[in-house]
């Protein structure tokens, strides 16, 4: 099989995995009363002040709206006043797809992604600026940075990592799913002391053949050397997708860090 065909199969698998996940999430009915908590009545929404913010960044070829059902997994009372955002990446030519235009946060030169794959440093930094603008808007609206969580899958996971590391303040946390390091070690010079206090959750399927498991494994040592606390979770048998177990784990992880953040405020 030619390298181009292998790539096309890998890309198709990545997009299919994202589509299947979105479909599965849409089919999953939220627990009783969850819809009312996630979408308050207009008067309640006006009276309630958002206490936290979760920003979810999708993978290559996907869209923000397709990932919105993810929030149905976050049924704990702590998320009653949480604001969610699922932005969509701009349509851009992607090198690994022979220049085809598709939703992409930055350019990707090759798939499968390994720990040694070339990176689009300038494109990543431009995308980071856009993510930081989203975060700054929520901070300006009164949400403490310590109650802001950035999460992402695949390419969105790589952007999550870059955005959290380069944000000048301590955030509630960054959660990476099947992501990778989108830059070299030189970026550590740009990381502020406050950013190093932001906790990282990194989840990766061992059977991932799009963003190889070795690419995920390279993350924690880099983060630890840079002064970050990183919790790494490996999922046997999981390919390039997100499992329900990962999302329930994320809910618990954010809830714990959100509680810690709120205690600091009180």
Swiss-Prot record:
The organism's place on the tree of life at top rank: Eukaryota
Keywords: Fatty acid metabolism, Hydrolase, Lipid metabolism
EC class: hydrolase
One of the GO biological process terms: regulation of plant-type hypersensitive response
GO cellular component: cytoplasm
Catalytic center residues: 154, 208, 240
GO molecular function term, any single one: palmitoyl-(protein) hydrolase activity
Function: Possesses carboxylesterase activity in vitro.
UniProt family annotation: Belongs to the AB hydrolase superfamily. AB hydrolase 2 family.
Name of the featured protein: Probable carboxylesterase Os04g0669500
């Amino acid at each position: 099989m030619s390298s181009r065909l292998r790539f096309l199969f890998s890309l198709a698998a990545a997009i299919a995995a994202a589509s299947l996940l979105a479909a599965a999430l849409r089919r999953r009915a939220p627990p009783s009363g969850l819809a009312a908590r996630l979408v308050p009545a207009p008067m309640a929404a006006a009276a309630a002040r958002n206490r936290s913010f979760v920003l979810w960044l999708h993978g290559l070829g996907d869209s923000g709206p397709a990932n919105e059902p993810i929030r149905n997994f976050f049924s704990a009372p702590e998320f009653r006043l949480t604001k969610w955002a699922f932005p969509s990446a701009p349509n851009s030519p992607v090198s690994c797809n022979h220049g085809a235009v598709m939703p992409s946060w930055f350019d990707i030169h090759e798939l499968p992604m390994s720990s040694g794959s070339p990176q689009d440093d300038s494109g990543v930094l431009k995308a980071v600026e856009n993510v930081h603008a989203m975060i700054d808007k929520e901070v300006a609206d009164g949400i403490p940075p310590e109650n802001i969580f950035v999460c992402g899958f695949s390419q969105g996971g790589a952007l999550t990592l870059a955005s959290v590391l380069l944000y000048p303040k301590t955030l509630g946390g960054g959660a990476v799913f099947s992501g990778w390091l989108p830059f070299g070690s030189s970026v550590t010079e740009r990381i502020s002391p406050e950013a190093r206090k932001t906790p990282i959750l990194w989840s990766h399927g061992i059977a991932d053949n799009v963003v190889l498991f070795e690419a995920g494994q390279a993350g924690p040592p880099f983060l630890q050397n840079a002064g970050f606390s990183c919790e790494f979770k490996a999922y046997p048998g999981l390919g390039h997708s997100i499992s329900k177990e990962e999302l329930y784990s994320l809910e618990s992880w954010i809830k714990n860090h959100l509680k810690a953040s709120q205690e600091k405020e009180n």
